[in-house]
Amino acid sequence: MARTTYKETALDEGDQLEIVHFIGGGDRSDPQPADDPFTVAGRVFSSRLLVGTGKYRDFEETARAIEASGAEIVTVAVRRVNVSDPSQPMLVDYVDPAKYTYLPNTAGCFTADEAVRTLRLAREAGGWSLVKLEVLGDQRTLYPNMAETFLAAEALIRDGFEVMVYCADDPIAAKRLEDMGCVAIMPLGSLIGSGLGIINPYTIRLIKESVSVPVLVDAGVGTASDAAVAMELGCDGVLMNTAIAQAKDPVRMARAMRLAIEAGRLSYQAGRMPRKLYADPSSPLAGLI
């Protein structure tokens, strides 16, 4: 139901009412240089690091880690409100939607219908049209179900959503999603929460070369060097959650990730030296004593 129709809509016998809010799912100082902004769906950001809000010990730690990361976009999951205990803390009390861009996601959805319904609820609850779509294949791998992802993306785009999409590291699928109208392609580096890093850097690079919309590595980052590798491959950004939230010191790891993203981006822009089979001395031989 659209918010604009609330006043004139009456509940009938047997109707069910769902009240939802946003939960953790998935330092604004020292951002990326102003001359190298990250742009998605016409929105401009300083930071190329996107962070999830789940798996932390509490909301206080969540807020401190996000602040240290420098991220401006935070992913949130949509869940039913516990109306029996309204005193329970809520994410919005700690992570201000006026300060950060909330990116509602479909974490936990295994069908296109579930994903579409979840994001429609998110739009009604918060008014957000920029969303992250993920349709999972099974509980064991949380690998993307691409058939259902295509169906959900088509329905959401038709409904006016701007879709950032979690997908397999498949350049053909990525191109199809771009052609459908997705505003960002988000291939997994490795399985969600695995910390295995980027298993197939070659296919990530192929995806980057195949599409013109932003490409962000989503899932699998375990430590700062993984984030730097993603950026050195030419990716436009990285989304992560577990690597920060499950670190021994999440706030310190968040800062490490911020620096890794910046270092990887600068390295990509600078261009690495060519690989050589044999040695090449740094000091000139002319004038050797």
From Swiss-Prot:
Keywords: Cytoplasm, Schiff base, Thiamine biosynthesis, Transferase. Pathway: Cofactor biosynthesis; thiamine diphosphate biosynthesis. The active site is at K132. CDD domains: ThiG. Its main location: cytoplasm. Belongs to the ThiG family. Homotetramer. Forms heterodimers with either ThiH or ThiS. This is Thiazole synthase. It comes from Rhodospirillum rubrum (strain ATCC 11170 / ATH 1.1.1 / DSM 467 / LMG 4362 / NCIMB 8255 / S1). The lineage of its organism: Bacteria, Pseudomonadati, Pseudomonadota, Alphaproteobacteria, Rhodospirillales. The gene is thiG.
